[in-house]
Amino acid sequence: MTHLFTHINQDGKANMVDVTDKNTTQRQAIAQAYVEMKAETLALILNGQHHKGDVFATARIAGIMAAKKTSDIIPLCHPLALTKVEVELVAEPEFNRVRIQSLCKLSGKTGVEMEALTAASVAALTIYDMCKAIQKDMVITQVKLLEKTGGKSGHFTSQ
């Protein structure tokens, strides 16, 4: 089976996909990321003792803002009128990590996978930024698309 990259034209050059003739559909994407850290770092966050303030609130807002700016930082993404962005952060002390899950929605001609991935990634980067003075060896891991609905390609769920 031949797979063609949609962002490469017949001359092999990168270009933005033309979505003019695509149908407008309800679209949704859910992405995740994890930030692994020492138990002591996670405890500071959860106990509200971090000297920079509320880490989860800051990461949540950063993720939401990033989703809205995705087309500004990823060159071939279309600017989208997102109708919903959620970023949820859940501490998993049994694994010494924070799980981040983002949800993006819209009614449009192109998907919101990149926006959901950007939201989760930037929320994770924000946690790292706020905690790097305490711990520099945190690990951002498992950034991936969990699910997407809508559009010509239909429903996708990560295995």
UniProtKB/Swiss-Prot annotation:
Binding site for substrate: L76, C77, H78, M114, E115
InterPro entries membership: MoaC (IPR023045), MoaC_bact/euk (IPR047594), MoaC_sf (IPR036522), MoCo_biosynth_MoaA/MoaC (IPR050105), Mopterin_CF_biosynth-C_dom (IPR002820)
The enzyme's E.C. designation: 4.6.1.17
Pfam families: MoaC
Superkingdom of the organism of origin: Bacteria
Catalysed reactions listed for this entry: (8S)-3',8-cyclo-7,8-dihydroguanosine 5'-triphosphate = cyclic pyranopterin phosphate + diphosphate
Pathway: Cofactor biosynthesis; molybdopterin biosynthesis
Keywords associated with the record: Lyase, Molybdenum cofactor biosynthesis
GO terms under biological process: Mo-molybdopterin cofactor biosynthetic process
GO molecular function, one term: GTP 3',8'-cyclase activity
Active-site feature positions: D129
Class of enzymatic activity (EC top level): lyase
Function, as annotated: Catalyzes the conversion of (8S)-3',8-cyclo-7,8-dihydroguanosine 5'-triphosphate to cyclic pyranopterin monophosphate (cPMP).
Family named by the database record: Belongs to the MoaC family.
Subunit note: Homohexamer; trimer of dimers.
Protein known as: Cyclic pyranopterin monophosphate synthase
